Amino acid sequence: VAALAWQIDAFHGGRTMSALLQVSHLGKSFGGVKAVDGISFDLAPGELLALIGPNGAGKSTTFNMVNGQLNADQGSIMLQGQELVGRKPRDIWRQGVGRTFQIAETFASLTVVENVQMALLSHDDLLLSMWRRAADHRRDDALALLDQVGMKPQADRPCNVLAYGDVKRVELAIAMANDPKLLLMDEPTAGMAPKERNELMALTKDLVLQRGLAVLFTEHSMDVVFAYADRIIVLARGRLIAEGKPQDIRDHPQVQAVYFGTGKTFEKPSA
């Protein structure tokens, strides 16, 4: 496994120097109502950035503009100097962006390793209809990806017998098939027990360190956010209201007010 190639640079003027991803003045409206109103943020290699906010804050809209499912009305999304606004999700994937989904899905009739092989087949521009003739396509590479997520021992099991936490691990291996620079994770721990949540996020953290990934993730569990994010951006009513390290966000009065109203705070982590 390649060692971490980049280091997170220092902050300067609220922006990250040598950023992999640069989002600038991003905006999106629906029916004349601004869902996202001019937000800007950066993301560096080797960093996990959490995008959070209460319901209706604009985080899903922002996330879907970055992954290409929605077109921005204004602003820019630059990945290593390449504009992503207006690009289709497939083109963004080819640019080096991996993704996991809130509800993990695999081909239930295929084995664990075959699911990853299918992703590699697609990455290599081979038609999925060729699968029967290419059933051994890059099997060793698929097994190596599964080894990174702790699923190699279950490589030949059908996906429909896996526990949900293991399906999430397979999905993570699939997301690595295009050797991404940026990984987008939509509610990665949704529907998981606390132990499974921690295992998945610890694994993600390891992949960030091993591969030099940049990770942007949305998440409702504040325990997960505070435990695993290197930095957090908080949206409310389409605007970015706070940005900083977990402890700074935990103690931020405006963030506390948005989530709880006045007089309440986030629970402190147990010793």
Regions found by a protein language model. Give the residues of each.
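Short, Lys/Arg-enriched N-terminal segments with co-localized hydrophobic residues
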Residues: 5-16
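Glycine-rich phosphate-binding loops of nucleotide-dependent enzymes
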Residues: 18-271
